[in-house]
Curated annotation (Swiss-Prot):
Alphabetized InterPro entries for the sequence: Exosome_comp_Rrp42_subfam, PNPase/RNase_PH_dom_sf, Ribosomal_Su5_D2-typ_SF
Name the UniProt record assigns to this protein: Exosome complex component RRP42
GO cellular component terms listed in the entry, alphabetical order: cytoplasmic exosome (RNase complex); exosome (RNase complex); nuclear exosome (RNase complex); nucleolus; nucleus
Family from the record: Belongs to the RNase PH family.
Cellular localisation: Cytoplasm; Nucleus, Nucleolus
GO biological process: exonucleolytic trimming to generate mature 3'-end of 5.8S rRNA from tricistronic rRNA transcript (SSU-rRNA, 5.8S rRNA, LSU-rRNA); nuclear mRNA surveillance; nuclear polyadenylation-dependent rRNA catabolic process; RNA catabolic process; RNA processing; rRNA catabolic process; TRAMP-dependent tRNA surveillance pathway; U1 snRNA 3'-end processing
Gene label: RRP42
GO molecular function annotation: mRNA 3'-UTR AU-rich region binding
Entry annotated with the keyword Calcium: no
Subunit structure: Component of the RNA exosome complex. Specifically part of the catalytically inactive RNA exosome core complex (Exo-9) which may associate with the catalytic subunits RRP6 and DIS3 in cytoplasmic- and nuclear-specific RNA exosome complex forms. Exo-9 is formed by a hexameric base ring of RNase PH domain-containing subunits and a cap ring consisting of CSL4, RRP4 and RRP40.
Function text: Non-catalytic component of the RNA exosome complex which has 3'->5' exoribonuclease activity and participates in a multitude of cellular RNA processing and degradation events. In the nucleus, the RNA exosome complex is involved in proper maturation of stable RNA species such as rRNA, snRNA and snoRNA, in the elimination of RNA processing by-products and non-coding 'pervasive' transcripts, such as antisense RNA species and cryptic unstable transcripts (CUTs), and of mRNAs with processing defects, thereby limiting or excluding their export to the cytoplasm.
UniProt keyword annotations, A-Z: Cytoplasm, Exosome, Nucleus, RNA-binding, rRNA processing
Additional comment: Present with 7110 molecules/cell in log phase SD medium.
Native source species: Saccharomyces cerevisiae (strain ATCC 204508 / S288c)
Xref: SUPFAM superfamilies: Ribosomal protein S5 domain 2-like
């Protein structure tokens, strides 16, 4: 979205005022309306599609394969494609790296939940396609991954768990599936405008923001990584430490409501 100098000044003053006035009438902690559809890709173990009110859209597919975890200890892999961006574009590589770090960290996905036997485990592939995005897409992607993983079903093991002394591959039931029992982390993005923090900034809010903040949430608490991110190329400034505390407190207060909403799909 391209705003004139006068529009930027008016919008910035509105967002930086006390209380802040957002163009769409949202309170500082409120998210844009979204639609989420799950389990719609028949060839995947789990899937989700999320559409935001501004037309941003993201699809996530979850697939799995059986690996020897003594040979391959990375049991989760995230790949991100963003329409209109090269695979080696900075924004794609940054988001891919962030999501891999969040999901593979100690507070991320518990790899023991993927273990089949003493020798074999499931490896989960998370494929993300951002069809359109009008603002920073990391929160939208995070919500889509959360919904897809929570709708994932894996084949039911019927062979023995102890297979270290017996050379046999895991055997699965022909029809029965087991729901993947994990608690995926979430990633929130906030905009810093003056002395105010705004959750889920829209495109026009991002254009006038002084800075951005990415905060991760897992298992009922804030976790690493926490990092700043530039939401535009022309208005980036440093921010004071008390704004970081304000952003952390906002996520800590409202993240449980987001988790409950996503779990009730």
């Amino acid at each position: 979205m391209s705003l004139s100098v006068a529009e930027k000044s008016y919008l910035y003053d509105s967002l930086a005022s006390t209380p802040s006035i957002r163009p769409d009438g949202r309170l500082p902690h409120q998210f844009r309306p979204i639609e989420i559809f799950t389990d719609f890709l028949p060839s995947s173990n789990g899937s989700s599609r999320i559409i935001a009110s501004d037309g941003s859209e993201c699809i996530v597919s979850i697939k799995s394969k059986v690996v020897d975890h003594h040979v391959e200890n990375e049991l989760l892999q995230v790949d991100v494609d963003i329409a209109g961006q090269r695979d080696d574009a900075l924004v794609v590589e940054t988001i891919t790296s962030l999501l891999n770090k969040v999901l593979k960290s100690g507070s991320g996905v518990d790899s023991s939940k993927l273990q089949l036997t003493k020798k074999y485990s499931f490896k989960i592939f998370v494929d993300v396609l951002v069809i359109s995005s009008h603002s920073h897409p990391v929160s939208l992607i995070s919500f889509a991954i959360y919904s897809a993983l929570n709708s994932t079903y894996l084949p039911k093991l019927i062979s023995a768990f102890d297979d270290l002394e017996v050379e046999e591959l895991p055997t699965f039931h022909d029809y029965d599936m087991v729901k993947l029992d994990i608690n995926p982390p979430l990633v929130f993005i906030l905009a810093v405008v003056g002395n105010n923090m705004l959750l889920d900034p829209a495109a026009n809010e991002s254009e006038v923001a002084n800075n951005g903040l990415i905060i991760s949430w897992s298992n009922g608490k804030i976790t690493s990584p926490i990092r700043s991110v530039a939401l535009n190329d022309s208005n980036v400034k440093s921010f004071k430490p008390h704004l970081l505390k304000q952003g952390l407190a906002m996520v800590e207060k409202y993240a449980p409501d987001v988790v409950r909403s996503l779990e009730n799909l």
